């Protein structure tokens, strides 16, 4: 069985409150900027080698109610061939995305996955 590793971990700054720095940014914009940063930090990673973008969404409503996983994949990677999926396990959504990516890599169904957690956008 293959091993799965977390190679990079990033977090956007806190600032979605009514007066916060990111109050006018949508979750998909913040996430796509995070993916772009990751790709720039790991130049040996060809973004077309990413097999899946798995997004945990604790509250799928308003701006993040659509298939935000696919939207983030398209916006962040600018590659149409990388799929995206949205997972809702409420407070465990982020943990579930890591478990899914790890299971896919260990079973040989994927080589590289990107996971992301989105939180409520309204304070």
Where on the chain are the PLM-derived regions?
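Conserved small/polar residues in nucleotide/adenosyl-binding loops
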Residues: 115-121
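Structural alpha/beta core scaffold segments of enzyme domains
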Residues: 44-49, 104-107, 113
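Conserved catalytic cysteine-centered active-site region
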Residues: 25, 57-111
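Conserved active-site "lid/cap" helical segment
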Residues: 1-73
